[in-house]
Regions:
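Iron-sulfur (Fe-S) cluster-binding segments and ferredoxin-like electron-carrier domains
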Residues: 311-328, 359, 363-377
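Beta/alpha (TIM)-barrel catalytic core signal, keyed to glycine-rich beta->alpha loops juxtaposed to Asp/Glu
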Residues: 114-318, 328-343, 369
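N-terminal binding-site loop/beta-alpha segment at the start of enzyme catalytic domains
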Residues: 1-74, 133
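Acidic (Asp/Glu)-rich catalytic clusters
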Residues: 7-10, 40, 59-71, 101-107, ...
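Short, acidic/polar
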Residues: 26-38, 89-104, 150-158, 242-250
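Active-site mouth loops of central-metabolism enzymes
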Residues: 17-29, 76-93, 123, 232-241
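Conserved, mostly hydrophobic/aromatic
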Residues: 6, 18, 46, 59, ...
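Short cysteine clusters
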Residues: 301-310, 351-357, 361
Length: 381
């Protein structure tokens, strides 16, 4: 297993995490076998947004004395009034459900402000006692960090700019990133993922990931497989379905991403997902899926790695990623981004201008110029 730090929290998360939703309604032996298989595979980051007591208790029981070995995202405002998943901003209801979660798990590592997708959602959290409750939970140590969940890049950016959150769970996959920000990606998913609205990588979504990386707000990912539609021959919006490895690699190569939450229902599901860890670069490569959309990406690095190997040993995708983040505000490059760049074994200033990378790039990126810009921006060269 590989591990990444979640933003500036100091928490190291397995790049393949576990979303608990698909364990809801399953018998305890199945939950136990699945959870333990995930732990044995090195999974140490779990999302428990489900409000039902039974699934919460089953997961906690399956963790047993290994609770201390994992970090849990628990959602403030997730309820099931009327036996239906629901969102609540009613404080007595919010407290009831979250304090039940605390009783079951003892503490929650990431207290997630649940489902902020609209201005109404934002106001219901940040202009009411809801946010005060979350801050008090952190002050008492009941939660260690404050995060939030969203599917809307515009609203997510607004939340991050409050300065109160340390991580974000966001829906990231190639199809979602091709929808303009004003298109509701969750609605598109529910309606079948039409490709008619695709318009190239949406700049607001790309800027959101870069903003998170620059501010040290870690990202965990939901909807990595698009509810299974991206890997389905019948439902894919692309000319051919993506593979699980391609979906995972796309999400994990976005700036700021620490972990993807996958919905395992069995030990076999866990074993299948872990194949990503030993997959070759060819098996992970998602660029063939773009096919006829390639013109929409002209000149834009998608961090695919086709440019490698570099004779100077430069990790070109990493340099481009840090450069894209720094370009958000070149006069105020975050120290953490500069430090990550400077920690690279080979830097942009070592570019030989041989042009081999540009010959291999499917998207016509001016890699040589990017290396020069990175050298100027980060190294003063």
């Amino acid at each position: 297993m590989e591990y990444r730090q979640i933003g500036n929290t100091g928490v190291m998360a397995s790049i393949l995490g576990m979303g608990g939703e698909h364990l809801d309604g399953k018998p305890y032996p199945q939950v136990e076998a699945t959870v333990r298989a995930a732990l044995d595979a090195g999974v140490n980051h779990l999302d428990v947004f489900m409000p039902g007591q039974e699934v919460r208790r089953n997961i906690a029981k399956a963790l047993g004395d290994r609770r201390k070995d994992v970090t849990i995202q628990g959602h403030i405002g997730s309820t099931d009034v009327g036996q239906q998943y629901d969102i609540s901003r009613d404080m007595p209801t919010v407290r009831k459900y979250f304090e039940d979660l605390l009783r079951i798990f003892g503490y929650i590592d990431f207290g997630m402000l649940f489902f902020i997708d609209s201005q109404k959602d934002y106001q219901g959290v940040f202009e009411t006692p809801f946010i005060d409750y979350a801050l008090k939970l952190k002050e008492k140590g009941d939660i260690r960090h404050i995060g939030f969940s969203s599917h809307n890049p515009v609203m997510a950016r607004q939340v991050i700019q409050t300065g109160l959150v340390e991580m974000m769970m966001f829906s990231i996959n190639l199809a979602f990133d091709l929808y303009p920000a004003q298109v509701n990606a969750l609605d598109q998913l529910n309606q079948g993922l039409s490709n008619e609205a695709f318009s190239g990588l949406d700049p607001q979504r790309a800027a959101l990931y870069q903003l998170c990386a620059s501010k040290g707000v870690g990202i965990t990912v939901m909807k990595t497989l698009g509810a299974g539609k991206l890997i389905s021959p019948e439902h894919t919006p692309f000319a051919q379905p993506m593979t699980v490895n391609q979906c995972l690699h796309y999400a994990l190569t976005r700036p700021g991403v620490a972990s993807v939450m996958l919905g395992y229902q069995s030990p076999q599901d866990v074993e299948k997902a872990m194949e990503y860890l030993s997959a070759s670069q060819a098996q992970r490569d998602y660029t063939p899926v773009l096919g006829t959309l390639r013109s929409d990406f002209r000149g834009k690095c998608v961090y695919c790695g086709h440019c490698q190997p570099c004779p100077a040993g430069i990790d070109i995708a990493a340099v481009n990623k840090y450069l894209d983040i720094a370009r958000l505000d070149p006069d105020h490059v975050p120290p953490s981004v500069r430090a990550h760049y400077m920690a690279l074994e080979h830097k942009g200033s070592q570019c030989l201008s041989c042009g081999r990378c540009q010959q291999r790039c499917p998207f016509g990126v001016d890699v040589i110029e990017n290396m020069a810009q990175a050298a100027r921006l980060f190294e003063g060269a």
